[in-house]
Every structure is written in C-alpha cells, then in structure tokens.
C-alpha cells in the first residue's frame, strides 16, 4: 500500500457532507511510486494526462433548483500528486447543496480546488447530459489481441519477463485489450480496464503482451501506476521511436480514471468505451 493512502478516506466509513468543503480532497504524492519504477519528477520518460470523468455531479441554482451534469477533469501526468478517489468523490458530493449561479462559476471553483490538490493546473469541463449522450461510445483503435490462445497461472505481480519481441524487425502498430484488471491497493476492490498500446519499434509478440497484461490481475496498485509500469516495461523492451499506453477504466463510485502516457506531448480525446 502507498504509505500516504493509509491516512486517506479510502476503505473507511465516511460522513457524506453536502455543503462545499475543499479540504476533503486528499492528495497522494506520486514520488514514492515513481521511485519504485526508477524515475523522478526530473527524469519522467513520458508526457501524459489522467482523465477523470464524474457522473454524479450536481449543485443548486440561486433559485434552489438542482442541476446535474458530467464533469471531465484532466490532471497532468507530471503533477506532484494524484488525488485519492474516495476523497475526490466526497469533495464532489459536498457541492450537492452548494449554490453556483453559472456553470462557469462552478468550473472555476473546481479548477481552483483540484489544481491546489494536484499541485499543478487541472483542466475542467462541465458538460450537459445531452452533450455526452450525443457523443456516444467508441471502439478502441487498432487490433484486439484478446482472442489469442495463451496460458498463464501467476497473477500476483506484473511479469515483464513474459514480454517478447523480434529485435530484427521494426513495426508500427496499434494493439488493444479489454482484459486488464488490477486491485485497489487499499480496499482490494477490482479495477477493470481496457488498454491501448501504440508504438513504432521492435516487433512485439502479441501473445506475450496479452499474458503480460493478464499478469496484473491480482496486482495491487493505483490505475496511474499500473499504466506507468506497462509503459516503462514496453519502452525497455522495444526501444521504440514512439510509444503510447492509454488505459480506460470502468467507473467506481461515480468516477472513472483514464491514464495516458506517451513519448509525444499530444493528449488524446476523452471518449467513452462501452463499459464506461
């Protein structure tokens, strides 16, 4: 478990406060997990963003009438802190009986509080239900590897030694899988995800990638760190010209978390998958 997470509200019974309280947000420094991966804030080998989507966002108009919407939050991948997910939920619930005259006023409040917790500017979009409904759901790009016939029996820790490539052959391809699963390091609850790997480098053996991703199945870590581990393991193996790892997780507690890590500085669209 991350030592800071032990003091978070995650896994504990909590009072649900319905009036604005930004102090509910619980930041967790990224540095400890980065150290496990052998990187520091000064040597991060990726660009990226963590997209969070909130499906339980509500507040009051000055008339007392409630409004519901969907919140989209973009937290820079190099921010000093992640925000613990239950504290994020509790904070958002504290807006339920709080008055905001306009969406812009709410958005400014969210950006201020979340940026303070993350330690770097957080971008916020508050979208109407009609907007999100019109967007619909999308399919992941590239080739799905889930139908490959693989054998695996160890699910406790990620196993980068399972990965194989052909160092004599360079390819550019996009692969995806819906079989990513890990567990919350505090509660043990399952985190279900889909992941895209896009790269140009040594030709990756597709079956080895699938068994490697499945090896996360009982691993306990936060979403962001799982994606960073996948990124680094692939980077070390493939020596790629470019590499992107993008995971989209199923929501828990009204929030889904979608980490994106890439050699390039371009951020992807925040689009929903069928399980989201």
From Swiss-Prot:
NADPH binds at residues 85-86, 252-253. It catalyses: 7-aminomethyl-7-carbaguanine + 2 NADP(+) = 7-cyano-7-deazaguanine + 2 NADPH + 3 H(+). Pfam families: QueF, QueF_N. One of its GO terms (cellular component) is cytoplasm. It comes from the Bacteria. The keyword NADP applies. Coiled coil: none annotated. This is NADPH-dependent 7-cyano-7-deazaguanine reductase. Its EC number is 1.7.1.13. It is found in: Cytoplasm. Its main location: cytoplasm. GO terms for biological process: queuosine biosynthetic process; tRNA modification. GO terms for molecular function: preQ1 synthase activity. Belongs to the GTP cyclohydrolase I family. QueF type 2 subfamily. Substrate binds at residues 83-85, 223-224. Catalyzes the NADPH-dependent reduction of 7-cyano-7-deazaguanine (preQ0) to 7-aminomethyl-7-deazaguanine (preQ1). The gene is queF. Homodimer.
């Amino acid at each position: 478990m991350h030592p800071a997470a032990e003091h978070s509200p995650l896994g504990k019974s909590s009072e649900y406060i319905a009036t604005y309280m930004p102090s509910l947000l619980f930041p967790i420094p990224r540095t400890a997990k980065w150290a496990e991966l052998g990187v520091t804030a000064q040597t991060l080998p990726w660009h990226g963003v963590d997209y969070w989507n909130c499906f339980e966002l509500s507040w009051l108009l000055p008339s007392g009438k409630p409004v519901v919407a969907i919140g989209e939050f973009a937290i820079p991948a190099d921010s000093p802190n992640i925000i613990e997910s239950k504290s994020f939920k509790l904070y958002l619930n504290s807006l339920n009986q709080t008055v905001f005259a306009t969406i812009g006023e709410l958005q400014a409040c969210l950006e201020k509080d979340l940026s303070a917790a993350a330690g770097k500017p957080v971008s916020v979009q508050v979208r109407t239900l009609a907007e999100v409904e019109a967007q619909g759901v999308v399919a992941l790009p590239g080739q799905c590897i889930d139908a490959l016939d693989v054998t695996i029996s160890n699910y406790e820790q990620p196993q980068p030694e399972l990965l194989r490539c052909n160092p004599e052959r360079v390819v550019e391809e996009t692969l995806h899988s819906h079989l990513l699963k890990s567990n919350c390091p505090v509660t043990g609850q399952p985190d279900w995800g889909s992941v895209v790997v896009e790269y140009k480098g040594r030709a990756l053996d597709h079956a080895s990638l699938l068994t490697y991703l499945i090896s996360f199945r009982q691993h306990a870590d936060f979403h962001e760190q799982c994606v960073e581990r996948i990124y680094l393991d692939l980077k070390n193996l493939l020596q790629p010209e470019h590499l992107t790892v993008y995971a989209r997780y199923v929501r828990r507690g009204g929030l889904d978390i979608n980490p994106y890590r890439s050699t390039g500085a371009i951020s992807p669209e925040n689009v929903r998958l069928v399980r989201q």
